[in-house]
Regions:
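Short secondary-structure boundary segments
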Residues: 45, 88, 113
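Short active-site-adjacent structural elements
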Residues: 50-51, 93-96, 116-120
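C-terminal helix-cap and adjacent tail motif
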Residues: 107-135
Length: 135
């Protein structure tokens, strides 16, 4: 699916499709547009499976889950579906919905077909000269 530090694969993905489960998940992020998705994928990190860099004890679980999640989003986009990273959720609600020890929600990805009348928010992207340097 995606690379991870030392191939630990510290992730779990939960597809949320039933109306009952979607209603509970929507309590974690109460935005009107979010409620219109036909399904969600909850991206979880298994804190017990994360690789930790020995030099400074930096755990790489968030990075690994982010890489796998973006692979998922790119695959959905390739199939004509719309996705959006949602990280501004209520962590207390997510812990209640996913109480497994060592699991922590990293992102919620709503997935669906983009409405034809959906406004496109063109964003200014930094130019290469702003983000790239050479030494």
């Amino acid at each position: 699916m995606a690379p991870s530090a030392v191939n630990k694969q510290p992730w779990k993905f939960v597809i949320v499709r039933s109306e009952e489960a979607k209603a509970k998940l929507q309590l974690a992020y109460d935005r009107e547009w979010f409620h219109t998705a036909p399904l969600y994928i909850v991206c979880l990190k298994d804190n017990s499976a994360c690789w930790t860099r020995s030099y400074d004890s930096k755990a790489h679980g968030d990075i690994d889950v982010a890489i796998a999640t973006e692979h998922l989003c790119l695959a959905a986009t390739e199939r004509g579906l719309g996705t959006c990273w949602v990280c501004n959720f209520d962590p207390a609600v997510m812990r209640e919905l996913f109480p497994e020890p060592n699991l922590e929600a990293v992102a919620i990805i709503p997935i669906g077909h983009i409405a034809p009348d959906c406004p496109r928010n063109e964003k200014r992207r930094k130019g290469m000269e702003e983000i790239l340097s050479e030494k």
